[in-house]
């Protein structure tokens, strides 16, 4: 938020989205390397011409990787309309997404969710990307409270090793792999009990 205030007179929303994607992409590849010079160029803390070239190049590569991931993943999403009107979408990112590459499971789940929100325009949508011991949640127009859901899952499945959190409508949950089925089933029950908002 501080960076946005710093540059709001220079960049529009779309430019900032490109900078964010370039940072996300580069941070994935620089996990164990500080990459300070490159990050400074992405944030335009140096030369504007270098910033533009780097951001454009990284966004092009990131978008190509996202497109490739979604070509593999979208056909494997299972969608269910719940009695409360929510369209619940689940994707096994362990088995139906490329591993060890960009985008990672959380970003993949978010990109899948964004496309499903367009597909199910005007409807409440929840997307769960899950792996052997985690689930990533995204939602639109669903009255969820992920930190509260995590707390309840911890109490209801004490041997599940449940932890996690996030915001009200975006978050992640970790659990022990042997309890995945139980945790995901309880999570689906909780989503089915959520209220919904009008999609504007």
Kindly give the residue locations of the regions a language model identified.
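Glycine-rich, acidic loop segments that terminate in or are immediately followed by a histidine
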Residues: 1-2, 6, 10-21, 53-200
């Amino acid at each position: 938020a501080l960076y946005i205030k710093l540059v709001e007179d220079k960049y529009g929303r779309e430019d900032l989205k490109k900078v964010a994607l370039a940072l996300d992409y580069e941070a994935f590849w620089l996990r164990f390397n500080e990459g300070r010079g490159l990050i400074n160029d992405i944030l335009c803390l140096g030369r504007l011409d270098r910033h533009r070239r780097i951001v454009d190049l990284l966004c092009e590569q990131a978008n190509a990787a996202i497109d490739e991931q979604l070509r593999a993943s979208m056909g494997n999403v299972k969608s269910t309309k719940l009695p409360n009107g929510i369209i619940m979408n689940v994707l096994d990112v362990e088995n139906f997404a490329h591993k060890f590459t960009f985008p990672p499971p959380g970003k993949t789940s978010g990109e899948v969710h964004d496309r499903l929100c367009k597909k199910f325009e005007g409807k409440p949508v929840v997307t769960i990307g899950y792996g052997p011991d985690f689930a990533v949640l995204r939602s639109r127009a669903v009255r969820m409270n992920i930190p509260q859901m995590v707390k309840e899952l911890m109490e209801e499945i004490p041997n599940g090793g449940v932890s996690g959190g996030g915001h009200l409508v975006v978050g992640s949950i970790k659990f022990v792999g042997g309890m995945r089925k139980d945790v995901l089933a309880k999570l689906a029950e909780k989503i089915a009990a959520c209220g919904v908002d009008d999609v504007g």
